[in-house]
């Protein structure tokens, strides 16, 4: 029971123990260690009883009810098929694997109730002293007579065996000498002789094996007889002790008078013993027949050996194949007959087991004595061992039959001889086995009462020890589960710390990115303003240079006119006498010219004032427009930074959602494990409650069961807490998802607003350009008018204007040099900022890749846990709907996780491709940075994360 070590403790004063019986050479080696028994005297070890039953396949006692008659000794054949050992588990389903004794199979007979005087109402232990002394004396006489007959038969068998062995050795020596002569004299035919030698050696090895087996059987029988004698001695002592104790018990507790029921029992016992004597005589006759058949087989072997020797001497090979076929068919028939006989025996043994278990159940209900149930349990174990040995023997014989069939032994011509030999072998094996079974049945009958009284005690003690072991195993499993939960909690805490560190690091980096983008935007705006100012200054310088060139040309023309006038004056002075009137006219013309010059100067001053006023108004308008552009750019940068902040916040929310999802999944897995553990603990508690019903008298069981109840309630509370934590995290996750959706909406609105602002700004810039072009046209027209007016100006005014223009040119050149220096310094700082920004982008990519790797690892861990749960449920081999549904649900979750893992890998590949494209675009943009630069748009394109990246940050497996 329960796989624990057992002993059968005797009553007080047991003087001897049964010796350990030798095992058959083909037996398995199961050894059960004998633990401490329950009595105060010496113990009869269970190991001896099991070895006795397993070695010799003893048929145990059969139990009938009170009103059953004596069953017949003829039985139907079993329906066992070849190639398969049927383990029929009846009334408890217990089949112990024991060894099988060679060529010994016991035929179990379902005859009378052997424990007829130890039956329902206390057996013979409470009857009068007359029955105690009369029945054992009859049993002893029958036992002694059968033992003497068996010893005589064994001695005869040993003598015959020795004679046969001597004859075999002589024939072996003759065969060896003939083979040596063949080697020396017939060398040309050595090949044929070698073949013959091999075949003869194989046959001889088979014959030797058969002889060895028969010799071992004889030795085995002798040893069994010795062991049975020792067991008989111990049985006598035990019977004597039982009689004394039952007499004392009858005097103290109760006295049962001789009734009709007891008389019937004694009469049935007498009839049974008469039948046993008849069966023993029958077995003796069968043994004699078997000895005769063995002699016949040995004679046939001698004849075959003689024929072989004659064949070797005459160098011929006649009828060799026929003899081989005959011998093989004989062996085949023997094996098949033995298999069929063992099948019949196995069916009978199973019937006996069923009957014994029913009897044990009935007795345990009627007589709650622990020793009797223990004895019945040991008898059942003996029967199981015998069944196992018979099944092993059947397997061996079936293997032999299959080997012979594979070698092609069975021929259709020799079918009749095979049938005859099979029948002969069946009769011999039946006779021998029935005889051995009868002897063993006697022993088991005599021991059954003691065994029945002792096995119940031992089963209860074994149940107690097994319950203790079971409780210890439950405690160990609980401690292991607690340790595992603690380890998982520490891992979860470590992952939380790591994720918090990553979040803080990401927040720092995002802040640095925001600061750098703001600085970059301001620097880009300043650079753009500087460039615009430089362009304006260059245009002014070009206009002034053109004015200077025009004025120089006008000066040259005026110089030429002056020289012409001087020449004319000189010519006029020479002609002064003739031209006084002309001088007067010239003076008048000069005065008119002076008046015209003064008028032109006044008009020029007025035009200059108007032009300066227009220039100042244009400058004011330019300043206003620049301030508006700067304000719009500042708004743009603020909105872009807020966009980036919102996206970073969305990514942080997504990462937080990922963490919560992972925590949720880990908690769900832990909850499932806890539920499974709770179910297991509840099942174990049910088992423990069942055990408690059987053993309420033991206070230790109650304490341990209370502890188990407390632990189960503690685990239920933990499961409830974990479920509440999961619900709370689910609510938090829903809130985070709602916040994320709100942020996404805000981001979309801000993006639409930024697009509108960009469009408005582009329109304003286009209007500004158009206004500047109009101003340029107006300035060009004014310059042309000034040129026209300056043509008529005096040389002094032209020189002054040239000097003023030269001074203005030098000032503009100095301003241009200063702006160039400022531009170089700002470009250098911008390059440094861009390098820092590139480093920050690389770090952000690395962090995103690490996050994706963590997601993939979490998914892989979840998939492996699902696989482990599926494997556990499939290994449990319970075909319940609930377990199948759980397996299907786990498989669906696993498929979903695999799909999410694929999505994560695709997102990671997209991220890598986007990073590569972004790096390439950034390099190209940096290469053409000095030629074409739009800071607002470039900033937007560089710092806005890709939609794939956003999706990837929002995905959680």
Swiss-Prot record:
Protein's name in the database? ERC protein 2
- Which residues lie within the region annotated Disordered? 1-44, 922-957
Composition-biased stretches, type Polar residues, lie in 1-13
Subunit field text: Interacts with BSN, ERC1, PPFIA1, PPFIA2, PPFIA3 and PPFIA4. Interacts through its C-terminus with the PDZ domain of RIMS1. Part of a complex consisting of ERC2, RIMS1 and UNC13A.
One Gene Ontology term from the biological process aspect of the record = regulation of presynaptic cytosolic calcium ion concentration
Q: Which InterPro entries does this entry report, sorted A to Z? A: ELKS/CAST
**What job does this protein perform?**
Thought to be involved in the organization of the cytomatrix at the nerve terminals active zone (CAZ) which regulates neurotransmitter release. Seems to act together with BSN. May recruit liprin-alpha proteins to the CAZ.
Alphabetized UniProt keyword annotations: Cell projection, Coiled coil, Cytoplasm, Cytoskeleton, Phosphoprotein, Synapse
Top-level taxon of origin? Eukaryota
Choose one Gene Ontology CC annotation of this protein and give it: cytoskeleton
Question: Which segments show compositional bias classed as Basic residues?
Answer: 922-943
Mark out the compositionally biased spans (Acidic residues): 948-957
Source species taxonomy: Eukaryota, Metazoa, Chordata, Craniata, Vertebrata
Residues with Phosphoserine modification: 65, 666
Compositional bias, Low complexity, is annotated for 14-25
Main localization is: cytoplasm
Q: Which residues form a coiled coil?
A: 140-917
